[in-house]
A protein has these predicted regions:
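Surface-exposed, charge/polar-rich loops and edge strands
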Residues: 2, 6-353
Length: 353
């Protein structure tokens, strides 16, 4: 039997995180919710009924002069108007900032986003969000709200495919990594060392950690986000061994030195920490970047789409399969494969596995 870890986001759910506001001058400001600040937990933030603060990307930021913004409501929707959704800039940092949202009617913020927001489809699609994206840009098993991008390798998994996987004796498990807007950012620098990775929070249950620790079969990751989640676990374990507690995984931590701990020791340290503190799941974040030279410790097989040039995802593929990535991509280009979010998929085996 093999263990198949579903999409790293396997049960993360894309939220309609893009909101359009308007100043009294008529200027349009787009606000893209990234992660909750106050309250800091996703579930609590989505349950807020009057106000909450989020870290956001702010489009047309130079036009926002710190005044309160009113939601743009071109269709004069009465339900939307009754909410009275407003945005106030609390802190500015270039094109990002902390925004406080306030509204009436006692709706939870999750409902506010459903009624007022749009699904943030990838910018490289070069089109506006369509109603069908609400359904299609979501995995069948999406459950936990928090992502601003879908784990698109999982879009290929219909119920028939999932049933077929189970029928073949392949175990399916859930991890959850909330995909951030950084997944869209190309590598602009000639040196990847200058490319900043954004923090992405992830959750793995105690039971799953035990099963991964004891697993003796090939480990299959559906999606590059699953790879980042699973490979980050090793370094979270290292922090538990050396510092006594789990810490976020820094971008270049895997390359700082040769780590001698076994996977079993590393995951065992996380398990011991959770059990000692009465916790049933690990909640932490990662900025891990996977480039050629990375030592894979958990993932053997990868299901993934075809990615755009000059992206960190191409670097991950190169690290995973070695120089064969060029042959794979040449074949895809020569045979008319579709790339990116709504494109075709591939099954890749780690070099040396």
């Amino acid at each position: 039997r093999q263990m198949c870890i579903r999409d790293s986001f396997n049960d993360t759910k894309v939220v309609p995180a893009r909101l359009h506001f308007q100043r009294e001058t008529g200027a349009h400001i787009e606000i893209f919710c990234l992660e909750p600040i106050d309250p800091p937990e996703y579930n609590t933030a989505f349950a807020s009924t009057e106000r909450c603060r989020w870290k956001c990307v702010i489009g047309n930021a130079k036009r926002w002069k710190n005044d309160s913004l009113t939601l743009y409501n071109p269709d004069s929707d009465e339900i939307v108007a009754a909410m009275g959704l407003k945005a106030d800039l609390v802190e500015r940092n270039g094109e990002t900032g902390i925004v406080e949202f306030s509204w009436r009617d006692g709706n939870p913020f999750s409902r506010v986003l459903e009624l007022c927001g749009t699904v943030p489809i990838p910018p490289y699609l070069n089109r506006a969000t369509e109603s069908i994206d609400t359904e299609r840009y979501q995995t069948l098993y999406a459950r936990i709200r928090g992502s601003v991008a879908a784990p698109t390798a999982g879009l290929h998994f219909t119920q028939r495919v999932l049933d077929g996987i189970s029928a073949k004796g392949i175990d399916r498990e859930n991890v959850c990594l909330h995909v951030g807007a950084g997944t869209f950012l190309p590598v602009k620098s000639s040196d990847v060392a200058d490319h900043p990775m954004h923090r992405e929070p992830f959750v793995v249950s105690l039971d799953l950690l035990k099963r991964i620790r004891d697993n003796k079969s090939k480990l299959i990751a559906v999606g590059t986000t699953s790879v980042r989640t699973l490979e980050s676990l090793y370094y979270v374990g290292v922090s538990c061994i050396e510092k006594g507690k789990p810490e976020d995984v820094g971008q270049w931590v895997p390359y700082e030195r040769d780590y001698e701990y076994s996977v079993r020791e590393s995951l065992g340290a996380i398990i011991s920490y959770l059990e000692k503190n009465g916790l049933d799941e690990l909640k932490v974040g990662t900025r891990i970047i996977i480039v050629p030279g990375f030592r894979f410790r958990l993932v053997d097989i990868l299901v993934t789409n075809f990615h755009q040039p000059e992206s960190t995802l191409i670097l991950l593929i190169s690290a995973f399969v070695g120089g064969d990535w060029k042959t794979i991509y040449d074949y895809a280009l020569s045979n008319g494969f579709r790339f990116l979010s709504y494109g075709d998929s591939s099954l890749l085996f780690r070099r040396g596995s």
